[in-house]
Amino acid sequence: VHPGIDSHLLIQTDSAINPGNSGGPVTQSGQAIGVAFQSNLRLNDVGYFIPVPLINRFLADIKDGRYDGVPEIGIETSSLINQHYRQYLGLPEDTGGILVERVVPHSSADGVLLIGDVLTKIEDLQIDAAGMVRYSEQQVTFFIEAENRQIGDSLQLQVWRKGKFINLTLTLKAAPFGSEMRNSYDELPEYVIFGGLVFIALNRNYIHSPGNMTPPLAYEHWYREIERPR
């Protein structure tokens, strides 16, 4: 099931996952190592499964009987592979880092990170110029450190700002938008008929229904109302 707005760590395997088998255990040497997730119809004998760390994070989340979700840092970044741009920013030669291009309003990073910051370290992991960190002997995106934590946890960051390194702490929050931006499944839409008109909540499912959403209306709602609330 895809929410349509985020992605998380998966493991690719050369064992095909047949339709209908999603949600079953993936085993190796008699031990469960993950949950079957999806196949790739464009490739032969390629499947993906949810790894144990993500499963453990989910189980810890629901211990209180409620699912709070995966926290989001709330930034958009760009790589700093271009050496000339790194020199322009004054970054030391032996420093990696990823450039903060946008901070999502009301997110975990709002009020902590600034546009133009270079994020160089997350917890004890060095971030390279492509935004990757070394995690369990693999190169993965630095967002993995946030995904492994719970909402309300703290995250230690190091950034390059105005020619010097500074250390920051942010408190992880859920994404600053509601369920209306996520795909929903097996749920009938709620609506009200009044005066011959049908009123329905504006959500992702409705927007992706052919012909239901005009570009001006989409812009008005998603940008003005959600990203720039009055």
Where are these predicted regions, by residue range?
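Active-site region of chymotrypsin-like
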Residues: 1-44, 93-96, 101
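PDZ/PDZ-like domain segments forming the peptide/carboxylate-binding groove
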Residues: 15-20, 24-25, 77-127, 214-230
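C-terminal cap/linker of serine protease catalytic domains
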Residues: 32-93, 139-156, 160-165, 177-181, ...
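PDZ domains, with a preference for the canonical peptide-binding region formed by the helix
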Residues: 108-110, 121-158
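C-terminal, low-ordered peptide segments at domain boundaries
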Residues: 130-131, 156-229
